[in-house]
Amino acid sequence: MKERAAFINVSQENKLSIAYDAPTRERLSAALDFLPGVLLEEELPARKEELREVAYLFSTWGMPALGKEQIRAYFPGLKAVFYAAGSVQGFAREYLEAGVQVFSAWAANAVPVAEFTVAQILLAGKGYFQGLRRQERQGRAAFDSYSNTFPCNYHVKVGILGAGMIGSRVLEMLKAYDLETLAYDPFASDEKLQALGAKRATLEEIFSQCQTISNHIANLPAT
């Protein structure tokens, strides 16, 4: 007999259809018995009885932040939450304290984020963003004139704050370019930064020397 599972989110649409496409849902349904539709927080009281058997919850961006008592009341049989996105800081603590395991797709989510970040760094190195605003106001010649004042991405310094999953991928991808990367991360070892082609630096050094800086430090009291 299949264990019960459900999708939960703040809305019926949201990002669920992107994170869980049709083939993914088919594979999940082959192993688990899903409740119909998407659970919304406001529906939980009315569906309390059928939720008692739910062992697994699946979500992504838009995961409701339930309290520990709500979790225990509505999902007494819950074993795990699978979150198809990155950070779980907004909701995970209450589940963990209720004895529920939380799994995140933080490693997979880091791939497109790192790709996007590298693209932005390379564009910033050409003065693209400021130049575009000048072009909108003064025409293409203003863009070219401003962009030509930038050294582009050849032998310039780029600062990366944080060498976690995303920051590490960014540093690894930047090794393909003739850049000098400076990294600030008090938790990363010298060996790790060296393998990523980065030089350890202080915040003061990065902000005083680097043309472009990309921040990947979690917004937490500890960091």
Model-derived segments and their meaning:
Residues F7-I8, V158-I160:
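Hydrophobic Val/Ile/Leu positions in short beta-strands of Rossmann-like dinucleotide-binding domains
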Residues M1-F103, S208:
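An N-terminal-biased, well-structured beta-alpha scaffold segment characteristic
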Residues L182:
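Conserved beta-strand positions in the Rossmann-like core of class I SAM-dependent methyltransferases
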Residues G167-S168:
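N-terminal Rossmann-fold NAD(P) dinucleotide-binding loop
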Residues A65-L66, P186-T223:
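Rossmann-like adenosine-cofactor binding region
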Residues A163-G164:
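Glycine-rich Rossmann-fold phosphate-binding loop(s) that bind the pyrophosphate
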Residues V100, A105-K157, E172:
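Phosphate-binding beta-alpha-beta segment of Rossmann-like dinucleotide-binding domains, i.e.
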Residues G37-E42, W61-M63, E136-S145, Q194-R200, ...:
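Short gly/ser/thr-rich secondary-structure transition/capping motifs
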